[in-house]
Design a protein with these regions (language model features):
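Short glycine-/polar-rich loops that comprise or flank the Walker A/P-loop
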Residues: 1-2, 113-115, 141, 177, ...
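Interdomain helical connector at the RecA1-RecA2 junction of SF1/SF2 helicase-like NTPases
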Residues: 217-279
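Conserved helicase motor
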Residues: 121-125, 144-152, 161-167
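Conserved structural-core and active-site-/substrate-pathway-adjacent residues in large, well-folded domains
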Residues: 8, 69, 94, 123, ...
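SF2 helicase catalytic motif II
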Residues: 172-206, 211
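Conserved nucleotide-binding/hydrolysis micro-motifs of P-loop NTPases
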Residues: 10-13, 124-126, 163-166, 186-187, ...
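Conserved SAM-binding loop
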Residues: 65, 119, 182
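ATP-dependent helicase/translocase motor core
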Residues: 1-116, 125, 129-140, 154-157, ...
Length: 279
């Protein structure tokens, strides 16, 4: 048997003894999980042998991979090959984090490093954007949005709100997913949210647009970042300098709501409804 589970009745260790050290996991893997790992091992090859594309199709048009997107992929390649299992990527808003990660997930699958992927977000609008991007960029990979009340499906890519996964993560074994992507991860590594993330024994990739100096240490600790430094960072000043973003200008003003207030017609406030309507 290529895998060993060790337990003292409280902790469970998973040991892929031919490739890695034993590590703590939250639950035993299923037979299907282990069969998938054996299959992936037979297909595995170095990420360096999987070319990073110069161009890709997005919404029917050919786009050129930007230098910093290529740099992020190369940084991930190096850390994956070194055996690191958690990664933090910092890219400013508007610099194509979703495109980058979808293209990188494709390379992980091609290298035999992943078959099942979980893409977590914390807002409905972000989930909508993620599933649209994944289905556009990865049309050959089955995917779906796991919403409350929807039965779990056996597809390659699962997009889900973290708020939903908190109540459903125990439906999955710890070995069910090979990669867990968390968008805007600096907001999502506290309390029960971190419990849901930590349940999965997977490669964890955190995405954030927040500059490193404003990220709390909890995020760096979760993603095993050395010296509180992301695995790859592209500062917004560089994006301005290189012409990938337009410099912003501050505009000040006072809205009628701020100056005059508002009358509340109903006492009931539904945060979920507010989220759907305004985000």
């Amino acid at each position: 048997a290529p895998f060993i589970f060790l337990t003292n009745g409280e902790l469970i260790y998973f040991w892929d003894y031919q490739n890695d050290d034993a590590r703590i996991v939250n639950s035993f893997f299923s037979r299907r999980d282990l069969e998938r790992l054996v299959h992936m091992r037979a297909e595995r090859k170095p990420l360096a042998t999987v070319p990073i594309p110069d161009t890709y199709l997005r919404q029917g048009e050919t786009r050129t991979l930007r230098p910093y997107q290529k740099g992020a992929m190369q940084a991930l390649d190096r850390t994956v090959e070194l055996g690191k299992r958690r990664f933090l990527i910092e890219l400013p808003t508007g610099c194509g984090k979703t495109d980058l990660i979808a293209l990188y997930l494709k390379r992980l699958v091609q290298a035999g490093q992943a078959e099942r992927i979980l893409f977590l977000v914390d807002r409905d609008q972000l989930a909508k954007q993620a599933i649209e991007a994944i289905q556009d960029l990865l049309p050959n990979y089955s995917s779906y949005w796991l919403k409350p009340g929807i039965v779990r499906q056996e597809k390659q890519v699962t997009v889900c709100l973290l708020q939903t996964m908190i109540g459903r993560y125990q439906e999955f074994t710890s070995g069910y997913f090979d990669v867990v992507v968390m968008d805007e991860c600096h907001r999502s590594i506290y309390g029960s949210w971190q419990t849901a993330l930590s349940h999965f024994d997977a490669l964890h990739i955190g995405l954030t647009a927040t500059p490193a100096i404003y990220i709390e240490r909890n995020t760096f600790q979760f993603y095993h970042c050395k010296d509180d430094t992301p695995d790859y960072s592209y500062p917004i000043q560089e994006a301005f300098k290189e012409g990938f973003l337009v410099p912003y200008k501050f505009a000040t003003g006072i809205t009628e709501l701020v100056s005059e207030g508002a009358n509340v017609d109903e006492e009931h406030y539904d945060p979920a409804e507010f989220e759907r309507k305004w985000t």
